[in-house]
C-alpha cells in the first residue's frame, strides 16, 4: 500500500510571480470593453490599498479605521501635481505621479503615525478613527487644497507623449496601474521577508516577549505604519490619475471601512488575501450596485458570514482545499462538498428572491406588477412568488442540514489523517 509523503505546499515563486505578471498583461486584452477596463483600474488601485492596509492589520495586528487618510492625502497631492504640470509650473512624467502620492502618504505617516502608534490594540483603533474624522472635517475648512464639496479635478493627459503613450485611453491607465501593482506587490512581499517584517509579526503575536528581548514595539509599529502609508499613498495617486478628480470622500471613514471589509473578506492571514478581497469587493460595489439596490445588504451578509464561519477569509478556504488536494483526499471530499454547496445556494436563492421582492415593493416602482429575477418575470404582489421563495428556502435549508453532518464528519476525518501524516513525516 502506497504511503503518503508530505511536502510543503510551494508552487514555486517564479511560477507564481510569472503567472501574476501574465495575468496583469492579458487581463486588459481579454476584458477590453470600456466598463471592464474601468473595473480593472479600480481593482488594481484597491489591491495596492488592501495590501498596504494588511501590512498593519494582518502583519502587525493594528486595526486601523483611518487608513484612507494616507491614500486620500496622497491622492490630493497627486492631483495638485497634475494641475501644476498642466500649468507648466512643474515637469514630471505622469507615470511617476503615483510616487508623489506615495511620498505624501509617507510624510503624513511620519506625522500622524508618531501619535497613533504610541498605543496598540483598541486604543490605536480609536485614535485612527478620530484621526480620519478630523481630516475629513478639515476638508471643508480648507477649500483651496481640498476643493470643498466638489473636490479637485485635473487632467492626466499632460506633457509630451512618449512612444505614443499619453494616458488618455483607459487601457494605457490600466497598464500603468498594473505596472505599479506588480512593483508594489513585490515590494510589500519583500517586506514580509525582512527582519522588520518578522519583528512586527513578533510584536503582533507576543509584544511582551518582543520587548523583553530588547525591541521597542512602538517603533516597530511606527516604522511599519510609515511604509504602509507610502504604499497607500501610491494607490491614492493612481486613483487620482484614473478618475481625474479627488474629493473629501477619499479621506473619509467610509473608504477606510471599505478597505477593512474587503481585506477581511479576502483573508488577513495570507499575503494574497487582500488581492482576492479587492476583486470581490470592487465587483460587489461597482457591478452589483448596478444590478440590485440590496447590494449593501449582500456585502454585509458576506462579511458577517466570513467573520463567523471563515475567519481566515476566502484565502483560507482556498488553501485548506488546496491542502486536501495536495494529499490526494479530494475525491473523498468532493461528493460531500458539491452537495452542501448546491443545497446552500438553493436556500440562498430563496432568501435573495424574497429580498429582491421586498426592495421592489418598497421602491419607487410599487405600481409595477412584475419584476425580473434572473431573467424570469415574477409578480411580487402575488402569493405564488412568495410561496416559491419560501419553498426554495425551506427545501434548501432542509437538504443543507441533511448534508451538513456527513460533510463535517468527512472533513474532520480527512484533516485528522493529514495532521497524522504530517506529524509522522516530521518525526
Language model regions located:
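Transmembrane alpha-helices and adjacent helix-loop boundaries
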Residues: 1-427
Amino acid at each position: 500500500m502506497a504511503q503518503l509523503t508530505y511536502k510543503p505546499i510551494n508552487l514555486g515563486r517564479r511560477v507564481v510571480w510569472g503567472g501574476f505578471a501574465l495575468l496583469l498583461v492579458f487581463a486588459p486584452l481579454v476584458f477590453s470593453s470600456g466598463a471592464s477596463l474601468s473595473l480593472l483600474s479600480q481593482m488594481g488601485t484597491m489591491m495596492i490599498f488592501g495590501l498596504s492596509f494588511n501590512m498593519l492589520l494582518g502583519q502587525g495586528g493594528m486595526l486601523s479605521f483611518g487608513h484612507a487618510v494616507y491614500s486620500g492625502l496622497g491622492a490630493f497631492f497627486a492631483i495638485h501635481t497634475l494641475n501644476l504640470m498642466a500649468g507648466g509650473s512643474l515637469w514630471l512624467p505622469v507615470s511617476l505621479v503615483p510616487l508623489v502620492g506615495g511620498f505624501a502618504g509617507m510624510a503624513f505617516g511620519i506625522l500622524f503615525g508618531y501619535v497613533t502608534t504610541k498605543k496598540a490594540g483598541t486604543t490605536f483603533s480609536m485614535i485612527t478613527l478620530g484621526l480620519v474624522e478630523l481630516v475629513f472635517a478639515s476638508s471643508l475648512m480648507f477649500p483651496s487644497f481640498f476643493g470643498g464639496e466638489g473636490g479637485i479635478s485635473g487632467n492626466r493627459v499632460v506633457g509630451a507623449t512618449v512612444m505614443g503613450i499619453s494616458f488618455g485611453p483607459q487601457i494605457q491607465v490600466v497598464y500603468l496601474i498594473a505596472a505599479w501593482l506588480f512593483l508594489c506587490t513585490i515590494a510589500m512581499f519583500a517586506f514580509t521577508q525582512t527582519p522588520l517584517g518578522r519583528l512586527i509579526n513578533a510584536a503582533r503575536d507576543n509584544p511582551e516577549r518582543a520587548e523583553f528581548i530588547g525591541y521597542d514595539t512602538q517603533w516597530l509599529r511606527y516604522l511599519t505604519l510609515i511604509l504602509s502609508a507610502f504604499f497607500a499613498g501610491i494607490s491614492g495617486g493612481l486613483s487620482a490619475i484614473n478618475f481625474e478628480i479627488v474629493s473629501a470622500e477619499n479621506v473619509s471613514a467610509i473608504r477606510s471601512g471599505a478597505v477593512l471589509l474587503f481585506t477581511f473578506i479576502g483573508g488577513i492571514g495570507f499575503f494574497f488575501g487582500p488581492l482576492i478581497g479587492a476583486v470581490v469587493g470592487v465587483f460587489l460595489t461597482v457591478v452589483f450596485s448596478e444590478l440590485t439596490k440590496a447590494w449593501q445588504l449582500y456585502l454585509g451578509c458576506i462579511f458577517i458570514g466570513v467573520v463567523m464561519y471563515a475567519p481566515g477569509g476566502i484565502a483560507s478556504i482556498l488553501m485548506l482545499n488546496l491542502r486536501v488536494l495536495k494529499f490526494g483526499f479530494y475525491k473523498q471530499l468532493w461528493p460531500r462538498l458539491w452537495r452542501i454547496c448546491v443545497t446552500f445556494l438553493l436556500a440562498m436563492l430563496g432568501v435573495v428572491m424574497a429580498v429582491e421582492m421586498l426592495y421592489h415593493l418598497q421602491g419607487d416602482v410599487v405600481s409595477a406588477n412584475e419584476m425580473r429575477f434572473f431573467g424570469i418575470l415574477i409578480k411580487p404582489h402575488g402569493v405564488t412568488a412568495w410561496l416559491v421563495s419560501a419553498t426554495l428556502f425551506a427545501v434548501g435549508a432542509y437538504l443543507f442540514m441533511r448534508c451538513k453532518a456527513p460533510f463535517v464528519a468527512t472533513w474532520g476525518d480527512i484533516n485528522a489523517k493529514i495532521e497524522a501524516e504530517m506529524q509522522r513525516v516530521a518525526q
